[in-house]
Amino acid sequence: MCPEEGGAAGLGELRSWWEVPAIAHFCSLFRTAFRLPDFEIEELEAALHRDDVEFISDLIACLLQGCYQRRDITPQTFHSYLEDIINYRWELEEGKPNPLREASFQDLPLRTRVEILHRLCDYRLDADDVFDLLKGLDADSLRVEPLGEDNSGALYWYFYGTRMYKEDPVQGKSNGELSLSRESEGQKNVSSIPGKTGKRRGRPPKRKKLQEEILLSEKQEENSLASEPQTRHGSQGPGQGTWWLLCQTEEEWRQVTESFRERTSLRERQLYKLLSEDFLPEICNMIAQKGKRPQRTKAELHPRWMSDHLSIKPVKQEETPVLTRIEKQKRKEEEEERQILLAVQKKEQEQMLKEERKRELEEKVKAVEGMCSVRVVWRGACLSTSRPVDRAKRRKLREERAWLLAQGKELPPELSHLDPNSPMREEKKTKDLFELDDDFTAMYKVLDVVKAHKDSWPFLEPVDESYAPNYYQIIKAPMDISSMEKKLNGGLYCTKEEFVNDMKTMFRNCRKYNGESSEYTKMSDNLERCFHRAMMKHFPGEDGDTDEEFWIREDEKREKRRSRAGRSGGSHVWTRSRDPEGSSRKQQPMENGGKSLPPTRRAPSSGDDQSSSSTQPPREVGTSNGRGFSHPLHCGGTPSQAPFLNQMRPAVPGTFGPLRGSDPATLYGSSGVPEPHPGEPVQQRQPFTMQPPVGINSLRGPRLGTPEEKQMCGGLTHLSNMGPHPGSLQLGQISGPSQDGSMYAPAQFQPGFIPPRHGGAPARPPDFPESSEIPPSHMYRSYKYLNRVHSAVWNGNHGATNQGPLGPDEKPHLGPGPSHQPRTLGHVMDSRVMRPPVPPNQWTEQSGFLPHGVPSSGYMRPPCKSAGHRLQPPPVPAPSSLFGAPAQALRGVQGGDSMMDSPEMIAMQQLSSRVCPPGVPYHPHQPAHPRLPGPFPQVAHPMSVTVSAPKPALGNPGRAPENSEAQEPENDQAEPLPGLEEKPPGVGTSEGVYLTQLPHPTPPLQTDCTRQSSPQERETVGPELKSSSSESADNCKAMKGKNPWPSDSSYPGPAAQGCVRDLSTVADRGALSENGVIGEASPCGSEGKGLGSSGSEKLLCPRGRTLQETMPCTGQNAATPPSTDPGLTGGTVSQFPPLYMPGLEYPNSAAHYHISPGLQGVGPVMGGKSPASHPQHFPPRGFQSNHPHSGGFPRYRPPQGMRYSYHPPPQPSYHHYQRTPYYACPQSFSDWQRPLHPQGSPSGPPASQPPPPRSLFSDKNAMASLQGCETLNAALTSPTRMDAVAAKVPNDGQNPGPEEEKLDESMERPESPKEFLDLDNHNAATKRQSSLSASEYLYGTPPPLSSGMGFGSSAFPPHSVMLQTGPPYTPQRPASHFQPRAYSSPVAALPPHHPGATQPNGLSQEGPIYRCQEEGLGHFQAVMMEQIGTRSGIRGPFQEMYRPSGMQMHPVQSQASFPKTPTAATSQEEVPPHKPPTLPLDQS
């Protein structure tokens, strides 16, 4: 067919190749889409004939550009690409020899070149952009069909232009095959193809890719068979039918047409009709136009050509006038034609678009109106094939509309009426079919859940009047589940609201017909709760729930929680706390398990009046305590601390109540994770003095399995929410056998581990709501999921400030978050939990220790505080949530100031003494609230007193920052002090309060102290504080966000934040000053300060901060393992905190918990609880396990950048215990905390009660130590002092000189420790002395203090700091006590010299500083003992830590061990883990 020589083939031969018109047709069709050259068939034919390399090369380059989707292929560089594609497509895919292997394209035979060109057209249709470029084209319109055939079987082909080809079927298969293939390809009637549709190709048009390929494959097979042997001219190859050009001139067209005129066969008559009517007239016009075109073309090209060739200038000049005229005229005509064409095309396109949109709208209307039937079909996945396309189009239109709206542009009419005009309501119309389908699926799921409920049987079928007389007379709109299912099946529910309304109607009918007290009504209530749960589960992202529904659900949940709390003994408080006033009113009586405190809290939460709060809380605490003790029976007949916490919580509704009250599910229980119920471990441990004897062991033992305990666990969380007191309880509870025994394997973090809180996202703490600035999630995000109470604890602090709002927020706390957050703190703080390990006598002995359980010192004060600062007690717990006491201390001192420093706090401390009796367990503490028996009481009281003394300033606006902090809780309770209230939100009392509160909260330290604490922190915190508590909280959160544990950060309450931050800073400084962990530690105010700011930060929160520092050390392990210093045990701890963050409230708290292996008891609460989340280096309870140095806690980096990014680098496991600050209770809790610390912090002082004296930096040990000791005493005795000490310690770590002094001054200035002592009725000095002497400074010796503060070892210093920070929680001091007692070995070293630099965590033994031997011996002592039992190493103690009194977390730690606190203490001294034992509280 093609001459073998590369020369030009004869025209006749060329015209016999159908590929030539096919190529020309392809280029004509897709010229615009594929950017192909514009030419006619004749031009291509001429170029091939002349062997026009330029023309052919340009065409090939354009085709290859499309095939390879690149624009750098030119006529000069196309050869390599051509060879590549032919090699792949032609040779590999089709198996034909690659002709380009032996010769270049130009050297190939013409026939082969034509075939290659034709194949390139096919390949171009396989490119990636074809779909997009041709999506608007119809395949049928592109396909070339024969015009017809005659009797002989010859086919007549028209491609385009003015040519018609004839294919004779004569020779061969080629022809026959071709014709067959064409026909098979869809050869249609000649009439089916408009005259100009086709191109020149006669065969299978290139139009359709598949057809083309079929044709080509056939052709090429023929060619391969015939081309080699054949050297034919013409189209008469052996296997090729003859193709030849039938006609191209007007005359030829007429002749061919006439030749069919007389034909008789149907085919030929049809062909004639088509040619004569459709083609001939058009072809004649085209030919006429074509005749003019060449002249025009010449005219156009001539001038150009001439301009290119100057040699022709003369000719050009001659022709110029004529050519110019012709050219202008021609161009004008062409332009007019083009404009007309464009206008026509545009109109056509617009018309098509309109029709398409109209069609879509009609379909949409049909779809919506026919939804009933369609929905049923949807459920069977039997959608019509066109629906997905329609939906895709509708979605695209919606997106386009949304984009235009977002740009503020006007919507075209077609986009402004996307919704079908149907009689349906607008809401129905807005739903897309997709959404409706999803809603239907969800409705079916909800209905299935409801039907499967055990109480659904009365509602499954329509009511029969045979057993329900006159039913249909009373009920006008009957409804039942089967009827709803029928409606659903029938597609009658167009919106979720209709479905919900029917369900509500059913429940309403039941209530209306059966009455309120009917069994059926109760069943309907159960079913309704089930329904709401299912709705929330299956309609997750919906914000369609009305406020009414939300509150109904909240009420139901609260009711549920109440009943659960009743069972657990004190878990109801949280539920009650949910609403500021409602919580008290509902939960107050019975829910609390007979705690009047909830009411107190409610009163404060309602924000009725601070003063009332301050007075009320004490009273309530007393009552509540009494009741609480009753309630605590869970614990084995002793008042449950959880109840007490609850009581306290009422005082601080936002802090505790709301959290707890917010959502039964919110707490651990809510999350679905086994939650420690308030009645459980904590409650078991709750009884202060009583409990140690009765509850300690029994609690310990039963804790895991006791239902109460479980409730306690939940309650704990709630308790934590309750504030320092509950927090402590919680810690204890958690620390002991896990409240949900099964929930946390004893091996993990049973006792203090609060991980159970995992169950739910932390709802924003009740107290948080008030401080909207600090989203609950920020506060407790970190552990939020773990504890669900994280925020609550901090919120306790925060809540204190947000007491009123908290009430309602409690509901928001639906998630475990808010409610549980305090509880989490509680866990960590739960001195009781920690305390239980201490022998009953020890507990008594450590009034301060148990007292935290007894509201008198810590909790007491909180109640007092509650009275004065409704939230104060809880706030303190909140701040100390993280570390238990520290939180409270923080609150009292900084955030804690509001508690301790305010008159209310003082009153509370006094009340604490009184409350102690109500909280019988605390009676030792209670009488001498400030100076409970033993150092602990002293510490606790001094802390309390300190806070209280300054607290006297509670009403002390002058003390606005501190006071405000302190009052914050109060505000939450009753009135929002501007600063306070602000603080609650900003500081979030939970979070900001700590951070800010730390600086701000210590009334004694006052803002000055806070600010003095650390210029940096103050800079951040101060401003935040100043600007607004809410802001502060948020900032804290933000800062925290920087921390590895943002969530933790979120969780930690102000106290937690502050404490944590301090701790973190301490830990950072002490341990590694890890990458600004300290800075992080002070996310609140000095997040960016880095390590250096750690000291400042600490200063910032002398009390709270110090606490925080201590806690961070602890929390660090748990909370900041990953980001913070892995070397710090924190690695594990860190991991663990975010998840677990037992201190939920204070992720930092969790970090604190984790911070030190020792803190594991606490840490576990935080991290331990979420062992999974925070695998933590320390296995279950073994912070040590991760603790690179038992003494070093990984700094606690709140996942969310807690206010206090306290990332004590290597705080030993104690730091977890440092969480002891968790013990938010002023004295009792403080004492508890103290034990907690020894337990949790080998370093000595638990994070919960890191006394400011405890310098954050080791290097500061000497100075800070002495000073710290004093400060610690002061802090213990007075929150202000604590703050000062805390500040000092941090400063010591960084700038010991000025800042420390400043801090000290400011702390003392606002309210000197003496003041606190006096206020406490426990003479701060006496208490301090007792505390120091007994425990040789809670954290041991001044040196330890220094180390603690400086976090030299970063483990206990935070502890120490925490102790200081948590004066409200003397227990923090007990941390050191614990150390001494819990770890007799560490006690020796810790008590005397915090220098604990020897401690594993590198901190001076903080335990000693606070180690009121008596107090410390209590709770923490037990922990320490356990640790000693486990004393095989830090790990042992850590583990012990984790398994607080009753916890079996560490086999090593035996319950007996706790009683042997002294031994444990010793152990702790040698091993920082001794502090970790402090954590046991947390570890439930």
From Swiss-Prot:
PTM-bearing positions, type Phosphoserine: 422, 571, 1014, 1312
Q: Locate the compositionally biased regions of type Basic residues.
A: 197-209
Q: Which region ranges are annotated with the description Disordered?
A: 170-241, 556-704, 796-825, 919-1053, 1165-1259, 1287-1320, 1442-1484
UniProt-recorded Gene Ontology molecular function terms? ATP-dependent chromatin remodeler activity
* Tissues expressing the protein: Highly expressed in skeletal muscle, thymus, placenta and lung. Expressed at lower level in brain, heart, colon, spleen, kidney.
Biased composition range(s): Polar residues: 223-234, 1451-1469
Annotated positions of the Asymmetric dimethylarginine modification = 1197, 1203
Assembly, in brief, is:
Component of the CERF-1 ISWI chromatin remodeling complex (also called the CECR2-containing remodeling factor (CERF) complex) at least composed of CECR2 and SMARCA1. Component of the CERF-5 ISWI chromatin remodeling complex at least composed of SMARCA5/SNF2H and CECR2. LUZP1 is detected as part of the CERF-1 and CERF-5 complexes in embryonic stem (ES) cells where it is involved in complex stabilization but is not detected in the complexes in the testis. Interacts with CCAR2; CCAR2 may form part of the CERF-1 and/or CEF-5 ISWI chromatin remodeling complexes in ES cells.
Query: Could you identify this protein by its name?
Result: Chromatin remodeling regulator CECR2
